[in-house]
Amino acid sequence: MSEVHQESEVEYSRWKRERSPERSQRRSQSPPGEQSAYHRERSPLRKRGNYYDDRTRASGPYPTFTKPLIDPYTQTNAVSYERFIRWYSKENHISATTEDLYNSLHGTYNNYKQDLYARTARSFVESHCDEAWFEDSYWVDESQGRVLEVSENEKSYRRALYDKFMDRLDAGYYDDFQLPTAEDVIEKPSIPDNDTDDSILPSNDPQLSKWNQDSRNDAMENTLLVSHVLPNISVAQIHNALDGISFVQHFSLSTINLIKNDERSLWVHFKAGTNMDGAKEAVDGIQLDSNFTIESENPKIPTHTHPIPIFEIASSEQTCKNLLEKLIRFIDRASTKYSLPNDAAQRIEDRLKTHASMKDDDDKPTNFHDIRLSDLYAEYLRQVATFDFWTSKEYESLIALLQDSPAGYSRKKFNPSKEVGQEENIWLSDLENNFACLLEPENVDIKAKGALPVEDFINNELDSVIMKEDEQKYRCHVGTCAKLFLGPEFVRKHINKKHKDWLDHIKKVAICLYGYVLDPCRAMDPKVVSTSYVSLQILNKPYVGFRNINANYTFPTTSYSRRNDEEITSGASSQKSYSRQEPMIHRREFYRTYQDLDAPNQEVPELDY
């Protein structure tokens, strides 16, 4: 045999599969079955229905995923009314939450929210007191040359509004003025189509009343809108930019929007007869700051809104008399502030007595005259002073007011036989407290609101940085300073001389905090105002077009409103909140369908469920 053939045979035998040995001769790494601890065998076959018999069971109870009931008074964000009730029931050992308990805790919940506002006021002021928008609103210090005074342009703007209102009053324009009742309000879809034509709406719709429509036209006349004004732009910068334009009558700013990157809206009001095209060219391109240039547009007012209903208690005889006194005081306050004639209240009352149309109505209440007079007084404050009486909020212009309440208010008839609810009493009490903050600030319990008088606040801060170490050893603890002195009076002199910047900052915080808590409609942290967890998430996200959480969709009240919470949640979230009663046809858009995404007009197929 050749040598090559022999090598191939060896290679073949190397990879050739040999026959397995006998079972008794096979080698195994495991010991034989007879020597093992147990005899291995196949488990018996089980029937189809008993395969759970020999399975091990979970030990112990299943874990619960409910959130713990934390004390709301220890948190810096608001909790919902339902969660507050559950915590209250647990703390007071109430076994079940009944409907009576649900309706009786409005006062307790309102006290909790007032305490929350007081606890978070100082931290909010300290974080925003150095911003321009906050300084313009609350920092009043004559030693620093900061005095809040009304400009001559604004006085002339108010005088023009006053003259227009009085001319209409003398011409009989307000002789039949009356707020719509709840029966007059026509229900419309909450989110109407954008293609809806206002001209096809019913003529008796309160939104299209002559007073409301004329108010809209007056607000948008000779006005341009500048959106997204940054918070670091001060009123002085706007004055320097616009005062040099001869045909600019007045400008106004909206309240700051803490959801939309602290942005504001600016409205520029021009004198009558101004060419708006030329005015737009003159205003556009003006640089207010290094990072902001004016780009104006036509003003906008929200549409498709309902009048906000006022609580029934406002129409009772005693409440109406008290509100009339407050209305007259607010009218006198506006006359003094804007240098207007002080006979407005008397002229309105005389006109209503002599020329008001009195329709025959059997259901007319006994205080019908007082109700109409109070409504006309409130309309005067709304049109001239741009002051919303029912929310105690002051605006800089009429168009700024219409952004929050474009359709005004509606009244409910008071039923003497009906018991006044706790929610209405709370609303009236809060309204009177807001009036006191504006009319009698010296009589307000400022400590309960989270502030102190300016001098007391400064003294408390000085005492907190003066540490007594021995009988004649007092140390300064301002920042990194650690100097020793013989007495506290020497430490105070040292702080006045060496730490003047720190002392000026403390004084600024004290002044701003005092004015901030006395403002009934002050801007607050959204997590303090809103109980929606969605709002807590979007605070750390850039603005992507969310609706303003602070907008008033129902009558503003400090008590709980389930509808208001749902609207806040749906407004702050980009996804619609789920409702169990919602029909399937409205939720169809959330389900995936096998339609052509390139065909936007393709209809959703009808599926047989």
Swiss-Prot record:
One of its GO terms (molecular function) is lncRNA binding. The modification Phosphoserine is found at residues 28, 30. One of its GO terms (cellular component) is nucleus. Residues 201-210 have a biased composition (Polar residues). A zinc finger (C2H2-type) spans 474-499. It is found in: Nucleus. The keyword Aminoacyl-tRNA synthetase does not apply. It comes from the Eukaryota. Keywords: Metal-binding, Nucleus, Phosphoprotein, Zinc, Zinc-finger. Interacts with ccr4. This is NURS complex subunit pir2. It comes from Schizosaccharomyces pombe (strain 972 / ATCC 24843) (Fission yeast). The lineage of its organism: Eukaryota, Fungi, Dikarya, Ascomycota, Taphrinomycotina.
